Amino acid sequence: MFSRQTLLALLSFSGSPVLADFLGPRYPPPADLTSKDSHVIAGWENLTEILQGYLKIDPEEDPILGTLKNTTFSVGLFSTRDDGATSKFQFHHNSPTTKRAKYGTKEVDGDTIYGVASITKLFTVYSALMNLDPTDWERPLTYFFPQLADTAKEARDNPAEHIQWDKITPLALANQISGVPRDGWPLFTTGEKLVGGTAAAAALGLPPLNMQKDPQLSTMPCSNFSDPNITSCADDYDNYVESQENRPPTFLPWANPAYANTGFILLGAVLRNLTGKSLDEQFSSDIFDPLGMSRTYTEAPPKDEWDNAVIPVNNDTELEMVYLLTPDPAKSSGTLLSTLNDLTKFGSSILNYTLLPGDVTRKWMKPHTHTARLDYSVGGPWEIPRYVHPETGLVIDLYTKSGDAGLFSSFLVLVPEFEIGFTVLAASTDRALRALIAGKIGDAVVNALMPALLEQAATEAEKNYGGTYVSTIEGLNSSITITRNKTEGAPPGLTISRFISNGADYLLAEAEASGAPNDPDAMPNRLVPTVVDEKSGRVAMRALTAMDAPKLSKGIISGILSADWTTVGGPTYGALDMGLYIFDVDDDGKATGVSPLAFRTTLKRKD
């Protein structure tokens, strides 16, 4: 697409060489999070001090963090490369409400059961990925629910008021870009003005509703949901689908991301139609049983497990309506209850490719669309904030699923670059502030641990890959020296500080050949991993320029040219990339040799 000479000319014109990194890790994931010398230990101690400080804040000083002490919460970090992290890195707080609650535990730990609300959606998509074939993902909903076909026809002439059901697929539902209504009345009534009664509706200037004659409500089964004498239709998937048929869309299909519980209920209905199993059976056979998630439930746990659960209710009525009420279709959207330790098993299984092949998982863990915020993308059903490292400008995507309903708020965050994840679980009767508080805890985790994880990964990479590699062929003067640039603000990645090939100084010769002999930073001498698989004993790294893109501003169009991904693999010799280096690693992850493939040689690491 763009030659290196073109890029160098552009960089010369701009005055400073700036190329953008690939998306992904800058070092192999860290394996030591729990030894006394690990930077992550220091990061966790810092986080602990921050959380303990938050618990001492007065509400008048900070109305959000000042109420943290009244929220029961648990925080845990886990790693696929250090099993000790799960037990080492946990923080728990018991609120006064929990300590005096009529039901449930008085002391939370890693096995305490919390509601996780919309984290449930991750389980639904996970299970769907195991059961839907590629054709199923692209079928219109009218294929699964033929009763929607008539409304789909009406939408051709009036898409503002009718949903285009024949344009929406399970893939659109999973990726939150289907345009279906957010919440399915009467199943979800949090935002329904009628819940406040007719007087409250009248105060807002809303007209009275006639359930039998209203053009919208009269088409819904069991539309008299507010009447306690009427059985709710929320326990039946078919009725639920029918109740959504004539509602207007939020957006056109595939036009704009919009959070919708309805979408995941419909995805659960698709899953049920294809497998013939209930969601309880599906989750158990696909996920709970294989992973040993013995304390995860699709509805409130049996009463003999309540001593292991957080149930911060004020009275029996609230217990019945908020904790025990579990309409069947909602099980694919937001009813799961789980523990810190069970969610560790769940998150680790995704990062480890335990239940899905690696290629399917990598495809899943990508943004599908963006929001209007530059730091926030959307996937299926990922919420993907983009963390920016304050010193280097490094961008790290945090694959997150939040949950907030009833008595509980939660966050599950996966970070593939480091092969780690963390969970925040919170319980409180203060629904107005609980989600904000859980989010503040998550902020603290990210800000304390991301720099520590990056530093630990860099330290291990220097130890495992740094040094000099030499030819073992007699008379061949070839060697590579790999170091780590520790200059403050230096872009992350190992550095080829010296490369002699057949007696020639390759780095100097490359700089002269590229027309930038006095600008070594413009040369590809920084190594970042592109294929990390110690199981095979081979790790691929590619050479990038020594500069990072986030440091300097670029033009909106001209900046497109300043990107390493546009030139990767461009310079070749004998059909092999000049910038590709394959390392041999032992069982401990330490490099024993390196093969710069284009140079047709293998260099052994000196002790």
Segments (PLM) and residue ranges:
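Fungal secretory targeting signals
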Residues: M1-A20
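Short hydrophobic "helix-edge" motifs at membrane interfaces and signal-peptide entry regions
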Residues: T6-L8, G110-T112, L266-L267, P329-A330
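Catalytic loop of the DD-peptidase/beta-lactamase superfamily, centered on the K-T-G motif
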Residues: D21-T97, D111, L324-D607
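Short active-site loop at a secondary-structure junction
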Residues: A42, I64-S74, K99-L173, P248-T262, ...
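Hydrophobic residues within well-ordered, non-membrane alpha-helices that form the packing/core
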Residues: L55, A128, F145, L271, ...
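Short, surface-exposed loop or secondary-structure junction motifs
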Residues: L68-N70, T80-D82, H92-A101, K153-F411
